[in-house]
């Protein structure tokens, strides 16, 4: 799951979609590929709708593959054959799916070194699925009797919505809104600095919204929670302008932003029946689930 904020696989902990590149081996853990060294960075790659413009998301994918092989405890092999289900926002799916799958279809064997361990992989298959739909895939059978339901994936830079009719995706009623939680982080950082002379980073905001104990004063907590509630209310108002009234339908919330903002979503009073997919890796798990269904008869 190639998020603008994080890369996620089925079994690994998410990591930030950020890379530092150098021609000499850096201190610490790194990946070596095509004569360059790469280390993970907390500084995200700037938002881009087209992630195929350079090799950075491919390098992040190599790291994800190595981490997933390790997590699955797959023993050392001379060559790993990799099947790679990936995803795109529903609104970009039709226009970008072929280009995105072609980006990962590298000819022949790809060799790299990660954490001082050599890997040789062959990507034998790449299939692309709509995000949001994939995250909700395992629960779609529970929505087959509902004439209308909405899947809302609140991510880093975007909030993707998709209408379901009797459990089936309606790709004519979907879009990707630039209403991700990074917009909220930036607003909180700016207001915290101007109003309270505080420097709040994303981990501070996450801790406050998760209800964890912090050393920040009560007015900082109130500011964060108020702006988070405004963010959620504004998002729902935007959806209503697009003729999606969430008060009278089931809404499946997925994505790290939805998990983070669950209290605000439930407090908004603007959602009839909210259903939460609490696995932050849900899109990645959904891609694998849909891929296994699709290839079961091969």
Where are these regions (language model features)?
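Nucleotide/phosphate-binding catalytic cleft detector across ATP-hydrolyzing
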Residues: 2-149, 168-182, 203-298
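Ser/Thr-glycine-rich phosphate-binding loops at phosphate-binding pockets of nucleotides
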Residues: 154-160
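PRPP/pyrophosphate-binding module of the type I phosphoribosyltransferase fold
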Residues: 161-166
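Long, charge-rich alpha-helical interaction segments
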Residues: 186, 190-193
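Short, basic interhelical loop/turn and adjoining N-cap
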Residues: 196-200
């Amino acid at each position: 799951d190639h998020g603008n904020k994080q890369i996620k696989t089925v079994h690994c902990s998410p990591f930030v979609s950020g890379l530092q590149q150098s021609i000499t081996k850096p201190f610490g853990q790194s990946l070596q590929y095509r004569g360059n060294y790469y280390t993970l960075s907390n500084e995200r790659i700037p938002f881009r709708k087209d992630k195929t413009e350079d090799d950075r998301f491919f390098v992040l994918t190599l790291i994800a593959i190595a981490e997933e092989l390790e997590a699955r405890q797959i023993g050392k092999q001379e060559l790993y054959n990799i099947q790679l289900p990936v995803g795109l926002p529903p609104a970009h799916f039709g226009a970008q799916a072929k280009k995105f799958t072609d980006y990962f279809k590298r000819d022949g064997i790809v060799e790299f070194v990660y954490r001082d361990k050599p890997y040789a992989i062959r990507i034998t298959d790449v299939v692309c699925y709509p995000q949001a739909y994939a995250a909700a895939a395992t629960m779609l059978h529970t929505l087959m009797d509902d004439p209308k339901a909405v899947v809302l994936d609140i991510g880093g830079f975007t909030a993707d919505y998709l209408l379901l009719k009797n459990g089936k995706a309606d790709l004519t009623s979907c879009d990707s809104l630039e209403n991700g939680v990074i917009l909220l982080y930036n607003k909180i950082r700016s207001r915290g600095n101007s109003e309270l002379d505080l420097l709040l980073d994303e981990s501070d905001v996450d801790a406050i919204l998760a209800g964890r104990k912090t050393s920040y004063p009560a007015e900082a907590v109130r500011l964060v929670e108020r702006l988070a509630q405004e963010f959620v209310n504004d998002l729902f108002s935007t959806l209503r302008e697009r003729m999606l009234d969430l008060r009278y339908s089931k809404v499946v919330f997925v994505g790290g932003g939805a998990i983070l903002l669950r209290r605000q979503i439930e407090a908004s009073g603007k959602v009839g029946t909210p259903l939460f997919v609490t696995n932050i890796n849900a899109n990645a798990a959904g891609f694998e689930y849909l891929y296994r269904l699709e290839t079961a008869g091969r």
